[in-house]
From Swiss-Prot:
Component of the tagatose-1,6-bisphosphate aldolase GatYZ that is required for full activity and stability of the Y subunit. Could have a chaperone-like function for the proper and stable folding of GatY. When expressed alone, GatZ does not show any aldolase activity. Is involved in the catabolism of galactitol. The keyword Kinase does not apply. Belongs to the GatZ/KbaZ family. GatZ subfamily. The keyword Cell wall biogenesis/degradation does not apply. Keywords: Galactitol metabolism. This is D-tagatose-1,6-bisphosphate aldolase subunit GatZ. It comes from the Bacteria. It holds the Pfam family GatZ_KbaZ-like. Pathway: Carbohydrate metabolism; D-tagatose 6-phosphate degradation; D-glyceraldehyde 3-phosphate and glycerone phosphate from D-tagatose 6-phosphate: step 2/2. The gene is gatZ. GO terms for biological process: D-tagatose 6-phosphate catabolic process; galactitol metabolic process; phosphoenolpyruvate-dependent sugar phosphotransferase system. GO terms for cellular component: plasma membrane. Forms a complex with GatY.
Length: 420
């Protein structure tokens, strides 16, 4: 990361896409996509996804590292080319607890990530806990971030410190996703970004972390990109020029969250304007979902009724029976809920892929389709871009390859934006 940031600050057009997903097919696609390049791949886990208690994936940071490395070994991607990051490390998971208890857990969270070899650490203590004011004072946020940084430094080996990097600040809104329709988004003001940096510098120095400050490579801001269930706020470069000019006076770059669904030209503009770390998550699993839905439609026509996976019906049944991952985000009417469950850009389905019933139905569908020849006309109907690549000899009509290439479509846009 340090080399990439140095190259960007030296004037090169270079950035990096941060893959924020724990789905094995998404991680496989991210690694296979860059297998034959010289680029490093940045894969990040969030604090609610992966933590010392297992998170919703059931994985600790060490488990997640081994999970990613096993996929890398399978696809032939060198482990040393993987950068592991921890996103929103702080009290995010424990906001319902008092601040002291939440911060104790946050300290252990950061230590677990660093001990597991994660080298990009987002110190985010911006969220209010049960006994806090809303919002937190910037000084309190910075003080807590310094406590988390001290925890990271206390367990890092000398070798790890050479690779260790910190990201500070947070976007608006705080992590969790948009629960209602968006019409516009508040772009971070220069004075707010400057105050974030200033308060963190002061808090770090007060705790004897002056050297650790040199490892702060990025600040999270909102450049004016966001999405909800069916709306996308697109990057307007002219509205972010004050931010772009301010960061040039520092040794840092920006990290932009929620960059999913932007155009490839927008990614290039974002990197040009020093938003050099572009986070993506739901767009990748949305592409996965599109591919699985397309294959399910193909299966519906090619496989006898008694042998079909019922994949789409199973997904719907499970999500309606167990609505905890989508209920507070999606619309309440039955028909509206079904549309959101299936097609929302927020892609809450991503929380359900590990469910045993859904996992088994997808596996059945894949086995069914691997045993038949899929007519080209059906691929043209349901996966038109993949049809074109089959026609040009770049791709085979194999279900797994079709899913991979669908995810590659998202990664291709980021490569265009980030490539030197």
């Amino acid at each position: 990361m340090k080399t990439l940031i140095a190259r960007h600050k030296a004037g090169e057009h270079i950035g990096i896409c941060s893959v924020c997903s724990a789905h094995p097919l998404v991680i496989e696609a991210a690694l296979a996509f860059d297998r034959n390049s010289t680029r490093k791949v940045l894969i990040e886990a969030t604090s609610n996804q992966v933590n010392q208690f297992g998170g919703y994936t059931g994985m600790t940071p060490a488990d997640f590292r081994e999970f990613v490395f096993a996929i890398a070994d399978k696809v032939g991607f060198a482990r040393e080319r993987i950068i592991l990051g921890g996103d929103h490390l702080g009290p995010n998971c424990w906001q319902q607890e008092n601040a002291d208890a939440a911060m104790e857990k946050s300290v252990e969270l950061v230590k677990a990530y660093v001990r597991a070899g994660f080298s990009k650490i987002h110190l985010d203590a911006s969220m209010s806990c049960a006994d806090d004011s809303i919002p937190l004072a910037p000084e309190t946020v910075a003080e807590r971030a310094a406590v988390l940084c001290l925890a990271a430094e206390s367990v890092a080996t000398d070798c790890q410190r050479e690779q260790l990097n910190y990201v500070i600040g947070t976007e608006v809104p705080v992590p969790g996703g948009e629960a209602s329709a968006i019409q516009s988004v508040h772009i971070t003001q220069v004075e707010d970004a400057a105050n974030t940096l200033r308060t963190h510098q002061k808090a770090f120095i007060a705790r004897g972390l002056a050297e650790a400050l040199t490892r702060v490579i990025a600040i999270v801001v909102q450049p004016g990109v966001e999405f909800d269930h069916s709306n996308i706020i697109h990057y307007q470069a002219q509205x972010a020029q004050a931010l772009a000019q301010w960061i040039e006076k520092t040794k840092m770059v920006y990290e932009a969250h929620s960059t999913d669904y932007q155009t490839q030209x927008a990614y290039r503009e974002l990197v040009r304007d020093h938003f050099a770390i572009l986070k993506v998550g739901p767009a990748l699993t949305f592409a996965l979902r599109e591919a699985i839905f397309a294959l399910a439609q193909i299966e519906q026509e090619l496989i006898a009724p008694e042998n079909r996976s019922r994949c789409l019906a199973v997904i719907e049944e499970v999500m309606l029976d167990e609505p905890q991952y989508w209920k507070k985000y999606y619309r309440t009417g039955f028909n509206d809920s079904l549309l959101d469950i299936r097609y929302s850009l927020s892609d809450r389905i991503r929380y359900y892929w590990p469910h045993s019933r859904i996992k088994n139905s997808v596996e059945t569908m894949m086995v069914n389709l691997e045993g038949v020849d899929i007519p080209l006309g059906m691929i043209s109907q349901y996966l038109p871009k993949q049809f074109e690549r089959i026609q040009s000899g770049e791709l085979s009509a194999i279900p797994h390859q079709l899913i991979m290439d669908k995810i590659y479509d998202v990664l291709r846009a980021y490569r265009y934006g980030c490539a030197e």
